[in-house]
């Protein structure tokens, strides 16, 4: 049994990240056997920056960052606001299709780690 239940999830910004979050948190929806019922407002962002370039000025190393802000609402009152950030460095690839696949896989792994932290945070409230 869970110690909390999620009534509603409002998702803002990055669609792919939000879909993954919503899917992972759905096991906590509408559990009547708990005393804590939360509404969540979740905003997520994904960014990619160049960390270094080669001698030709082409990107050599990238930084991928995923940030998620969560507002936990209980009885129409904000109970907790928290930001979660994860990032990863990776080398450029000549095959842009492979680069995109790697970026998406890396972002997905970062989101998984943040989801674990979100669940721990909700359990601690």
Each language-model region and where it sits:
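A structural "domain/chain start" motif
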Residues: 1-37, 47, 125
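Surface-exposed short loop/turn segments
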Residues: 23-28, 32-108, 112, 116
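Amphipathic, coiled-coil-like alpha-helical scaffolding segments used for oligomerization/assembly
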Residues: 118-125
């Amino acid at each position: 049994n869970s110690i909390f239940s999620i009534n509603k999830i409002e998702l803002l910004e990055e669609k792919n990240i939000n879909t993954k979050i919503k899917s992972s948190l759905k096991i906590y929806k509408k559990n009547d056997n708990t005393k804590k019922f939360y509404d969540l407002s979740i905003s997520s962002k994904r960014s990619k920056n160049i960390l270094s370039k080669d001698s030709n000025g082409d990107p050599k190393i990238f930084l991928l960052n995923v940030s998620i802000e969560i507002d936990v609402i209980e009885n129409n009152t904000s109970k907790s606001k928290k930001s979660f950030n994860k990032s990863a460095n990776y080398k450029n690839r000549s095959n842009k299709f492979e680069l995109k696949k790697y970026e998406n896989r890396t972002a997905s792994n970062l989101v998984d780690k943040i989801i674990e932290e979100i669940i721990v945070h909700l359990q601690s409230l």
